[in-house]
Structures are given as C-alpha cells and as structure tokens.
Amino acid sequence: MIARILSINANDLFCEVNHELKKLHAPGRWKHQKINLAPNDLLELNDQGEIIKLIERKNYLNRPKVANLDHVVLVFSIKDPQLNLKQLFKFMVYFESQLGFKPLIVFSKLDLDHDQNEFKKIVEALEQINYQVFKLNEPDDFLRLKNLLFNKVTIFCGHSGVGKSTLLKRLDNSLDIWTQAVSAKLKRGKNTTTATKLYKFLDGYLVDSPGFSIYDLNLTKQQLSCGLIEFAQYQTKCKFNDCLHLENSADCYLKKKINSLIYQIYLSVIKSII
C-alpha cells in the first residue's frame, strides 16, 4: 500500500491511504537516521498498515516544506495590488533553483484599467524565455490552465488580494468540501493554522501553505545571478564563473542574449542587495 502525507503535526502523519484519511507514525529509528518527512511524501506500507519505506522524491521544496511537486502557479494582479515585477522575479528564481522547473504565471484583475502596451511587453518577454503565461480574463487561458493542473500536485503563490482564493474555487468548486473534511480531521491545536496541508484538487492535490511569504526568501546575489533556468544556461558562457551580469561585468554573455526587459528587472533586484 502507498500512503500520501497530507499534513504533519509533531509526530503525527495525517495521510491518505486508499482514499481514506489515516493517522500514521514514522518508525522510531527514522529520527536517529535523520529522515525528515514532508507533506506529499509517499510512503510504502506493509500489510499491517505500518510505514516501511519513504519512496524516493522527484523534487523537494525547503520552504514551504513539500515534496514531489508537479506545478507552481504564481498569481499576480495587474492592479490592486499593483504588479510588482521584482517580486515576481524573486519567486521565479526561488522555485526554479529549488525545483528545476519553471513556474506557471497567472495574471489577474485584467479588467481593471492598466497600460495594455506595457503589459503586452511583459507577457512577450516572459514567453520569449519559455514561461507559460495565463490571463484570467481570457476563457481559453483559463481552460488551458485547468487542463494543465488536472491530476497534478500544485502549489499556488501570491500576495493577499490578487484573487488566488477566487481562482481556486473557480478551478474546482468542490475544494471547500474537501478542505472542511481534512481540516476537521487534522484539528490538532493552534500550530496547524500555518502548517502546510494537501487538499484534493482537480483529481490531484493542492498544497496550501498559509505561512509562506516572499519576504522569507532571503535570496543571495549568487542565487539571483544563476537561479533562473534561462540564466543558468548562459552563466557557463560568461568569462567568470561568478559573473553577476551587471552593466560593467566583463565579457558577460548573458546580458547580450537575455530579453532586455527581463534583464532590467534582474538588475533592479540584484542592485537592491549588493
């Protein structure tokens, strides 16, 4: 049998086993072996329902702690709150450097008044370096996003007020029912309010991590300079391995090749920490 960890509270592992919620405990020796478990870890069970093995992870995110992700969805509004490209860039760097794949980028509140030409340039710049961009005011984009997330494990990230909750309910209107069922099962005290949990979502799973914030990232200049997949492929062609790709960086290959708008966003981010 296989168990999927939905949430962890101290030594209690709340898992889904054969479509039922079960409370399991890791073998005592795992603590001494420093085997640290995370939500969405898959566990092999014996016939008695005891944990015997942690199935190898395909990826792992350190903050919030979660394993085996298929998609990261970054939700940013065009206004209210105003689109912050520096924060978007930081999210992109963080998730790509940790997981090795590009997040999906969703823009909301496009019905509000905004500079359409400027927004078009942003979308084109992101698509030029192979990001999938979704505009929630376009039905085809919404359907394309929904199809991509079907039967997958997904985490959504975005600041308060960008419309993330509305989007989730629009994607899967049964989410509230499952959320209430799991929350009742996992009710174990005040610490669970910020604990990472998994909920059924589009025949897959939604990772809910209410305690996670962009302000927790503390990215270094080295992470920023090569964290994006697109940046990493150019980093090796720069004259210096530790090139920061600044305007005065000698023989920097990246600044010759990368989209100019993306490069300007990068400069504004890295200059804020050096």
Curated annotation (Swiss-Prot):
Main localization, broad class: cytoplasm
SUPFAM superfamilies: P-loop containing nucleoside triphosphate hydrolases (SSF52540)
Pfam families in the record: RsgA_GTPase (PF03193)
Cofactor annotation remark: Binds 1 zinc ion per subunit.
Lineage top rank: taxon: Bacteria
Co-factor(s): Zn(2+)
Quaternary assembly: Monomer. Associates with 30S ribosomal subunit, binds 16S rRNA.
Protein name, UniProt field: Small ribosomal subunit biogenesis GTPase RsgA
Provenance organism: Mycoplasmoides gallisepticum (strain R(low / passage 15 / clone 2))
Record gene name: rsgA
